[in-house]
From Swiss-Prot:
Similarity comment: Belongs to the Gram-negative porin family.
Superkingdom of the source species: Bacteria
Function: Serves as a slightly cation selective porin. Major antigen on the gonococcal cell surface and it may have pathogenic properties in addition to its porin activity.
Keywords: Cell outer membrane, Ion transport, Membrane, Porin, Signal, Transmembrane, Transmembrane beta strand, Transport
Subcellular location: Cell outer membrane
Designated gene of the protein: porB
Protein name, UniProt field: Major outer membrane protein P.IB
Pfam families membership: Porin_1 (PF00267)
GO molecular function: porin activity
Amino acid sequence: MKKSLIALTLAALPVAAMADVTLYGAIKAGVQTYRSVEHTDGKVSKVETGSEIADFGSKIGFKGQEDLGNGLKAVWQLEQGASVAGTNTGWGNKQSFVGLKGGFGTIRAGSLNSPLKNTGANVNAWESGKFTGNVLEISGMAQREHRYLSVRYDSPEFAGFSGSVQYAPKDNSGSNGESYHVGLNYQNSGFFAQYAGLFQRYGEGTKKIEYDDQTYSIPSLFVEKLQVHRLVGGYDNNALYVSVAAQQQDAKLYGAMSGNSHNSQTEVAATAAYRFGNVTPRVSYAHGFKGTVDSANHDNTYDQVVVGAEYDFSKRTSALVSAGWLQGGKGADKIVSTASAVVLRHKF
């Protein structure tokens, strides 16, 4: 009897040691279709169509904490993509970190979402597969939402206000360059407001080179003094959801050929949704105003509409149906794209 009790006690020790470790994730897959029509000088010059079974952002992660005493905790997370299409490789390719949390707030180091990326849920409430992200998601404003190898501090909430600062060293950022990030949040009785800013010495991009009869896209430091400012506000009472967002980005082209010319664009977006029992219909609209490229006016305007609905089978399983329309440019030279998707999701 004593041996049985000892064996039972020893078997329980690993469970107790892992009591603060949580396994979580989501499996998302579905079917998507897309069509893109390019117009040049008023005539159709290119048409692309397709349909496929795709992954819509599946992931798996582990997170935990340890009580260090005196109100201090060690916190950690290891998260990675887990595509049902078998396209993800490696550990920690999503937000992963280790840090300390206490009355002073939270400080973390690792691969961390920026404040811009944190506001993304209130700018883009949609999901897409590999080839439909530019149409089924509010992708124009999301271009500067990244994850950085960095250190980040998040303050405690005080009277509805909270803030964050983040720093990514240049030696960790590759083509992204040294960057500074700041965020400010406010929430009260369902109302919320967010500001996120990015300040970057060199901006990211790609350039194409030809070698051995092949064309390659490589990272290119082609913009400098990049600034992105985003304001988001809205209301959410778990039934009615409304949000509006505005973003302005400004940079200079880098290099002798460009003469450090000025580049900028302003974008806006809005989303509304209302929950009827298990069904939540939603609609989003986004617009990119005419900006400047190479210090000259440039018709990089766009208009986008996404509509759809979610159906909750349970707290963990849901389905999403969505359709999107995107037009880049106007008049005789434009690209008109449409896409649709039916997605099944399960969270654990």
